[in-house]
Amino acid sequence: TVFCGGRNGRDWEFLIRIAQAMPEVTFNCVMPKDKFEEYKENFGKNMVVKSDIPEQEFLEFMCQSQIVVTPLDTEAPAGLIAFYQAAANGKMAITSDTVTTQEYFADGRGALCGRDIEDWKNTIQYYLQHREEADSSAEKFKRFLENECSEEKYAKTLWGMLVG
């Protein structure tokens, strides 16, 4: 089971095409109501889709999945909150290869895919079948966030800029 959820920057149309190419995998999705209405006719039998649910339910739904999959439709930072939530819950992230995501997911901290359905399909299948590697990737990403994105690191960097 894989999870995709959130608001801004998600490429829902592309995600639906990935799900259609992987009928044997369940896709748990949480999308905004307008996107739900726009795409509901295209949901496959392997898609469990909810919209506009409370955050606690969102997190519980995410935790029922092995991997968080987030195709993006923008180069701008998007999906970061979902990635942080995934890391906090020990879930590996697979997302679009963008300038922003390259920085976060380098060195085995996640997987990046291009605009090719087969690439996404193969990557998702690989990590669903290799749980230890997915867990290791999730742990690396969690450590990276704790070390590089902490309030302490931010304060030190800001202080260095002010006095430097």
Region locations from a protein language model:
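Short acidic/histidine- and often glycine-rich active-site loop of Leloir-type glycosyltransferases
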Residues: 38, 97-108, 112
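Acidic donor-binding loop of glycosyltransferase active sites
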Residues: 62-78, 91
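Conserved acidic donor-binding segment of nucleotide-sugar-dependent glycosyltransferases
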Residues: 107-118, 126-132
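Conserved donor-binding/catalytic loop of nucleotide-activated donor transferases
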Residues: 63-65, 85-92, 96-97, 106-107
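Conserved donor-binding/catalytic core segment of Leloir-type glycosyltransferases
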Residues: 1-10, 16-20, 28
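Conserved acidic donor-binding loop of glycosyltransferase catalytic domains
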Residues: 72, 95-97, 113-115
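Nucleotide-activated donor-binding/catalytic signature segment of Leloir-type glycosyltransferases, i.e.
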Residues: 31-61
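A charged, aromatic-enriched C-terminal amphipathic alpha-helix characteristic of glycosyltransferases
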Residues: 129-162
